[in-house]
């Protein structure tokens, strides 16, 4: 059974015809190769070994038919049951996959531990808006210091929240680890580009964040996570264009 | 066993001492009587008959100790296990209560039906920011038409999404119904105050929304929902002050 088949296929865009529904038993993920939210679904499918295929979508020239998969036209969307069912939103798709495939469950079964993982993820997700603000500052020095400071603050908060090796609180990564990793990976890519980056691209995020640095290295080296990630040079290249306002969703293909 | 004991107690504020932990088996909800998000937890506890007590918090003069219950100091927060456990966030507390008390489960057990209820709630929640924008327009005519139009649009979208009697898709109300009701109740209160309100306070929301009107009447008349709600005159009175910038969290007590 394939897992994440077609992850590096070119995007479908307005004018392209709608692909036929996924075959029975195959879970299709609508994706954009550099989208951190869609990557959450990819990582989960990869770690859980879900039979899956990926279709990439042009986010500036969306096909009309895509709005029948996601009413807002965003990624990710999960399509199953030969096209008859859809699940959207980056935090809901993983939980749904856990409910559907409990034998490879990543979220805890205990209600209290489960809800704490979801709440921790939401708390850690403060890194995302801080990242986008800092990214905008790359080409615009105005307010750059404040934006960098806000991003550093998000990292400091995460460093404090990381009390063991993983945000799961266990000996192996869990829901919060896998789902927040893509956001950190975006900052890692950005650290190659940002003028006076507050983070080290060599020993990311740098010596002030020893726990996060070890965590990032560990997550990054998990084969199932790597299989759901773009290589660093692709990510850096994409963001170079993105910051100029000309993202190339097929960068490197 | 009491349910929602103390729902009309006066707020605790900065300087007030921390209450002793809830007794074993009692679920404490930190609340503000007019907060639609906290009311989600109250309705769920009421419908599920969870042994519970309510402590109201002054949202402009928060007690320092409250930040140990909710790191942002917001309501709702659920406190249990004699003060040793906390669950926050208005959509997570209800799901947690369903996991904890599965015999009175409101969310569907089927994974697909469950995630669709959660996604539908998020879609319906577009009414909330539109409500706050329209409320600000009460005392400021600038941009009022656009703000009213956005709120009407949220109602039109909901009217379309309500394909049966309830957002649950079943013969009785479910997760999405109970959790979105407080937001509609706020618009109902506001319709008594708004100059040129686009909604009728007599047959709320009005003749253009026949399905929502029936839905609202039905939800409003459920005793367990009423027990978790403030009476109309209280809500209207609170919002009158709120719109002047001087909310009285103990209004009517």
Curated annotation (Swiss-Prot), chains A, B:
Residues 110-238 form the GST C-terminal domain. Residues 25-105 form the GST N-terminal domain. GO terms for cellular component: cytoplasm. Belongs to the GST superfamily. Omega family. Keywords: Oxidoreductase, Transferase. This is Probable glutathione transferase omega-2. PANTHER family: GLUTATHIONE S-TRANSFERASE OMEGA-RELATED, PTHR43968. It catalyses: RX + glutathione = an S-substituted glutathione + a halide anion + H(+); L-dehydroascorbate + 2 glutathione = glutathione disulfide + L-ascorbate; methylarsonate + 2 glutathione + H(+) = methylarsonous acid + glutathione disulfide + H2O. It comes from Caenorhabditis briggsae. Exhibits glutathione-dependent thiol transferase activity. Has dehydroascorbate reductase activity and may contribute to the recycling of ascorbic acid. Participates in the biotransformation of inorganic arsenic and reduces monomethylarsonic acid (MMA). GO terms for molecular function: glutathione dehydrogenase (ascorbate) activity; glutathione transferase activity; methylarsonate reductase activity.
């Amino acid at each position: 059974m394939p897992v994440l088949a077609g992850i590096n296929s070119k995007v479908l865009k307005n004018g392209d015809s709608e692909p036929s529904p996924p075959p029975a038993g195959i879970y299709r993920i609508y994706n954009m190769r550099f989208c951190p939210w869609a990557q959450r679904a990819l990582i989960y499918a990869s770690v859980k070994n879900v039979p899956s295929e990926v279709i990439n979508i042009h986010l500036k020239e969306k096909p009309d038919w895509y709005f029948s998969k996601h009413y807002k036209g965003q990624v990710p969307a999960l399509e199953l049951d030969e096209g008859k069912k859809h699940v959207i939103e980056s935090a809901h798709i993983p939980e749904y996959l856990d409910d559907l495939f409990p034998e490879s469950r990543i979220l805890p079964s205990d209600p209290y531990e489960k809800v704490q993982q979801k709440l921790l993820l939401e708390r850690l997700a403060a890194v995302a808006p801080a990242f986008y603000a800092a990214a905008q500052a790359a080409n615009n020095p105005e307010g750059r210091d404040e934006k960098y400071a806000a991003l550093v603050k998000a990292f400091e908060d995460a460093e404090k929240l990381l009390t063991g090796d993983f945000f799961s609180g266990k000996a192996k990564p869990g829901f919060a680890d896998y789902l927040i990793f893509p956001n950190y990976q975006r900052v890692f890519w950005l650290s190659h580009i940002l003028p006076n980056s507050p983070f080290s691209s060599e020993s990311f995020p740098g010596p002030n964040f020893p726990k996060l640095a070890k965590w990032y290295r560990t997550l990054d080296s998990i084969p199932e996570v790597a299989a759901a990630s773009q290589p660093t040079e692709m990510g850096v290249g994409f963001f170079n264009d993105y910051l100029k306002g000309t993202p190339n969703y097929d960068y490197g293909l």
